[in-house]
Design a protein with these regions (language model features):
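Outer-membrane beta-barrel proteins
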Residues: 23, 59-63, 91-98, 127-132, ...
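Transmembrane beta-barrel strands of outer-membrane/channel proteins
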Residues: 37-39, 55, 68-72, 88-90, ...
Length: 243
């Protein structure tokens, strides 16, 4: 009887190690939605209104990842438009291994102030993760795309192009994130038609769902539409909301 009472007392005094070990780990998030919002409205000696909106949605199921992005920028001064640009994209990635995946993407761009009425791109590609650590990630990718575009002067053209891109992300100890993306699009029919897009961003969290984001976007077109300059620069600040 005494041995049984001793075992019972030991069981009651011991911490529930077995129960804790059997608790299931939280399931990874399959769907993620991020919104970027920025707005400026000034009146008085100058009347200026501008807003920028960014949206990114991703859904993951085992090896397949589906993504959708959208961006909008609009600005006006003294009642007249001074900036207008829209971007959208769809992408599907399929992981072949831990660091290699194949993908298919489709993109849309409209920027009347750069002479672009519409620009479409679609094609397959391959992505390779070069660095994957707790704080740093670096990946590169290449794709062969079909491009179709129409200028604001109603000039149409279609061509094949290569797409080369790189993406880097660094997490600081405070969970602040620095990201850098670079994309190079090369026309296979006209060698002088080279386009480079670079975006540098810094995101500082205020809570689990809300953060402040500052980004600097550079778009270079070596062969712009007649009457337009080669380089566009855009600095945006605003709030980022994650769901």
């Amino acid at each position: 009887m005494r041995p049984l009472l001793g075992l019972l007392a030991l069981a009651l005094a011991s911490p529930p190690v077995v129960a804790l070990a059997q608790e299931p780990a939280p399931a990874p998030r399959r769907t993620q939605l991020t919104l970027d919002l920025g707005f400026v409205d000034a009146s008085g000696n100058s009347n200026v209104t501008s807003f920028n909106l960014g949206e990114k949605l991703s859904w993951q199921l085992e090896r397949l990842t589906l993504g959708q992005t959208a961006k909008a920028l609009y600005g006006e001064a003294e009642g007249k438009p001074t900036a207008e640009a829209y971007d959208a994209g769809l992408r599907a990635d399929y992981a072949l291994g831990k660091t290699i995946s194949v993908f298919a993407l489709g993109t849309f761009q409209r920027n009347p102030f750069a002479g672009i009425a519409e620009r479409w791109g679609v094609g397959p590609g391959i992505a390779v993760g070069l660095v994957r650590s707790a704080r740093d990630t670096l990946s590169v990718e290449g794709a062969l795309t079909a491009q179709r575009e129409r200028s604001t002067a109603n000039v149409r053209q279609s061509f094949a192009a290569t797409r080369t891109a790189a993406s880097f992300k660094h997490l600081f100890a405070t969970a602040t994130a620095f990201t850098q993306t670079l994309e190079w699009l090369a026309n296979l029919d006209t060698m002088d038609d080279q386009r480079v897009t670079s975006e540098t961003a810094l995101t500082a969290p205020l809570s689990k769902q809300i953060a402040l984001r500052v980004s600097y976007l550079i778009r270079f077109d070596n062969l712009p539409e007649p009457g337009f300059v080669k380089t566009d620069r855009l600095l945006t600040t605003g709030a980022q909301i994650s769901f």
